[in-house]
Amino acid sequence: MQHLVLPRSCIFVKMRGINRLKTWTGMVLMALLLGGCTPPDDPVVPMVPPSQVYLEVPSSFPRPDFPEDNAFDDVRWTLGKALFFDARLSLDGAVSCGSCHLPSRAFAAPEAVTPGAFGTTGNRNSSTLTNVAYQPYFMSEGGVPSLEMQVLVPLQEPSEMAHNVVTVCEELAAEYEAQSMAAYGRSLDPFVLTRALATFERSLLSGTSAWDAWQAGGATDPSVIRGAELFGGSGLGCNRCHAPPLFTSHWFANNGLDDWSEDPGRWRITGAPEDSGAFKIPTLRNIGFTAPYMHDGRFSDLDAVLDHYEVGGAGHAHQDSLLVPFSLTEDERTDLKMFLLALNDSAFVQDERWMQ
């Protein structure tokens, strides 16, 4: 299986049904041309002294990279948070970013597929935004090269928010005028909206789980230690795809699901047959909060996931060669689940910064 990094010139939207597969380059260009998304000639300087109170980087993590035209500060973060929870970003005024990415669920959702504007649904589960700042590309097929650009996808996708970024900014510009000017020195437009939302999302850093405390020298349950040995070490080799500390490799893999024809995943970007059914490997951090699992939310709990992997997948023609059958005793399964649940970060999901 090839692990490909998407060229920045190749941009595709996540479409929730293969019947709507299409490029979204035209959509982005229209937003850039009509919405004034290009940065001003002079660097934008916030109208208040920069503050970074709302950016808390875990001690074991590097500081996230921020684009030159979107350096972090609290004024931009505050604007981004307000937009994140504003349901008026959707055409029917009922769906916000926070409708599909709930803080209490580690910025995922409890449904297999969360309804979008007007109750429409697609075929993708809402992925967690945990540590999204470290992702090199976005969407499950890896078709979007930046977090700022990713914002345009759900906002304009018919089965999600079903709106138009230019229209949204025109409708909300007056209300957000003061915040937008303070944050970016200009009225709300696609440039401001995409960058403010990306700023908020880059602050969603989770690295204070029980596993992190153990790695820092703290005590932990012996079951967690045994589960960690199964996970990596001389055990199952799960860490080959879910490598610590982020517990993802940001690669793409076909994990052997049987029904892939309606959503071929990475194939949409590469067109390579071997990429049919391959999706970006998700982080396992906060896995206890992010059920249901898989790109389509088909598995309701961890036992269903382990059942799938224990038999070596469903035999997809292009499934990853790392998927081979294995057998766990009841005690081993308990230990492995204890380890996975040690990746939960309760402080993260209860953080008052995210509360509306």
Positions of predicted regions on the chain:
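Periplasmic c-type cytochrome electron-transfer domains
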Residues: 37-356
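Bacterial N-terminal signal peptides
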Residues: 24-35
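Enrichment for repetitive, rod-forming helical segments
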Residues: 15, 29-31, 340
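Bacterial N-terminal signal peptides that target proteins for export
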Residues: 4-6, 15-26
